[in-house]
Amino acid sequence: MTAQMHEAGRTKEAGNRLQAWRTGIDTYQEPVVYMRRDCPVCRSEGFTTQARVQLTAGGRSIVATLSVVDGDWLAENVAGLSESAWASLGAQPGEPVAVTHAPPLDSLSHVRAKVYGNSLGDAQFGAIISDVAAGRYSDLHLATFITACAGDRLDLAETLSLTKAMIAVGDRIDWGRPLVVDKHCVGGLPGNRTTLLVVPIVTACGLMMPKTSSRAITSPAGTADTMEVLAPVNLDVPSMRRVVERTGGCIVWGGSVRLSPADDILIRVERPLDLDSEGQLVASVLSKKAAAGSTHVLIDLPVGATAKVRSAHAAASLGRRLQEVGGAIGLQVFLRVTDGEQPVGRGIGPALEARDVLAVLQGTREAPADLRERALRLAADILEMGGAAPAGGGLKLATEVLADGRAWAKFQAICSEQGGLRSLPMAAHLHTVESPGTGRVTRIDNRLLARAAKLAGAPTAPAAGIDVHARLGDRVEAGQPLFTLHAQAPGELAYALEFVRARPPIFQISENV
């Protein structure tokens, strides 16, 4: 019976062949196939738009979402592939592509169970994440899973199960050392680009720090976005190893080394949803740290009224979960709670943040003091937890390494090994927002500031973002610049400016303070 079923499947596949054609349509990394409504395959299989179909060519198979089209732009005997589908399938122009129904997804029953408030275990999360990593989930499926886990819907046991499932489907690097240090910031604080300073300081002191970083999810720039302005970050594991062996560290995009492929897929859908829950955050961060071969990890927890973590209580809760899950998967997790009431540095957006980083490394007069001090404190913690400095001696060592140029030399070496230090792009369109009155800056809304920078084009447009001119506690006069919007397109500048004008003031100016 089984042999007959396989034979029937092969016969059906042979009769459901269309010619591969590259459409050039960018579907944001979701594989999509376009087929004529009146093509023989659609008619014989009863395919409709949003159907999940399996495409097979030359022994390679992927699952894609079907879009049914009318009109003559697509030939009747052609399967039009989106850019993502074309790259994933690896088909050649005109190559026969077999189109069949995708296998049923049993793991979706676990997603539905989570939607209705049920708890999931290792087996259920393992099945879901395995299907996610294999590309079997559509963006609709992914959005449902992400939403079902959002907020406080993952308890500690579920967070651990999700973390282990993410580690299981990716590669894991073994550096052959008992001590490999790392850091992560939970985010929510614009301009907090300390990693690009901490890595060269720490590695200049002899510790190994292979830093895999993420791109922005809900922020105007992730560490990988900012580093990419200065040097290539899309390195594979052999290239990453070479950089680390020669310099002691690296700053690369985690998605390019396939350490947690399921997380990279989830992040792609989390970004437009603007969702980033605690359980998913913990699983995302720690799965990548474990996969990257880290043993000791420092977590930066900025706390502020408009940061991602809004209270000391929330920071303690998140920190506790990070340490408990980290301990369960063999990581030593250390915490530092930092001030998250206002942006760090002056620039918000990849190129503007990179400019601030270079200023600190080079010790120029324009270097933001707050970015410098924050990075030194974090580097000091890592130097002490890694044994490169005695307890209480980390700050002195970090300060010396930054001041005498060793950190700048190390950063240049890392950039060179990753592909070369690049010059910074500049935005073509700027608009300065001025203070409406005289007084003191008593509040800065980090969330609105980050949103405005995103609407201006960051991080997609690397030069886009915001330059901040005033800090908390500063006294400003009416008409004095508060911040400047940077955009690479006039439409994006207008869009961001419209947002700023329609919302409550990002900078609160109080006259009687």
UniProtKB/Swiss-Prot annotation:
Alphabetized, the UniProt keywords read:
Glycosyltransferase, Transferase
State a single Gene Ontology molecular function. thymidine phosphorylase activity
One term under GO cellular component: cytosol
Q: Which domain of life is it from?
A: Bacteria
UniProt record, GO biological process: pyrimidine nucleobase metabolic process; pyrimidine nucleoside metabolic process
Q: What is its EC number?
A: 2.4.2.4
Q: Which reaction does it catalyse?
A: thymidine + phosphate = 2-deoxy-alpha-D-ribose 1-phosphate + thymine
Q: Which Pfam families match?
A: Glycos_trans_3N, Glycos_transf_3, PYNP_C
Q: What SMART domains does UniProt report for this protein, alphabetically?
A: PYNP_C (SM00941)
Q: Which InterPro entries match?
A: Glycosyl_Trfase_fam3, Glycosyl_Trfase_fam3_N_dom, Glycosyl_Trfase_fam3_N_dom_sf, Nuc_phospho_transferase, PYNP-like_C_sf, PYNP_C, Pyrmidine_PPase_CS, Thym_Pase_Put
Class in the EC hierarchy, top level: transferase
The family line of this record is:
Belongs to the thymidine/pyrimidine-nucleoside phosphorylase family. Type 2 subfamily.
Instruction: Give the protein name, as stated in the record.
Output: Putative thymidine phosphorylase 2
